[in-house]
Amino acid sequence: VEKPEFIEFEKVCRNGGILLEESQRNQFKDYVNLLLQWNSRINLVSRRSVENIWTEQILHCLAPWTVVRFPESQRILDLGTGGGLPGIPLAILRPDADIVLLDSVRKKTDALREIVKALGLKRVSVATGRAEELGRSAEFAAAFNSVLARGVAPLEELIRWARPMLARSSRVKVDVRSGQRPFLLEGSTLIALKGGDLAGELRAAAVKTGERDLEVFDLPLLDEVETGLEGKKLVVVRFSWGKTGPV
């Protein structure tokens, strides 16, 4: 018998155009069970969100993909992944993507390796380290098409950390207002799930990093259910690789 929380989760996904196959449904259920088991020993997600894990964690991490989408076979970094969020939900949704889960806390990454193995996510790997240091390493420099971040740091810092890890790609200006949703992400991008005073954060990021192509999107999937995620937005940064390119 399906739990009511999962039934509601799947209904919201379906209404938002996310249709899950049976294997994906099972992976999501297994992931939540593993996350809860590990969370009793290691703080992978906040204790207060455990009660509403399907909405406050999983649904939040799927919400961006009703607004934007990646091309096929992308290499993506989940920066400051914590409990594998948003990287693991994306990996379940998009098994064609190569995803690296990065966190600086070894206890978390050790747990994530076990979770990834148990879920059979063959194209997901886990790394331990700090983004500001790994961006200078041969393994991580210019290695990714996109960087994801969820509630990790101010946008200005995320841009600085992401820039050296992104492969240079010609920027394509997309008219998102006339395009069909979810619109295709082009070029090198930072995808950040954010909340709070975004106006000030966006201004500071543009001034201090020189990146000007920053766009904010609502997450309509979250309006389908009562959550503690009111005011959450998606920020997409398309890197210019002009004077603001990697140094």
Spans of features found by a protein language model:
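Conserved glycine-centered beta->alpha loop in an early N-terminal alpha/beta scaffold
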Residues: 80
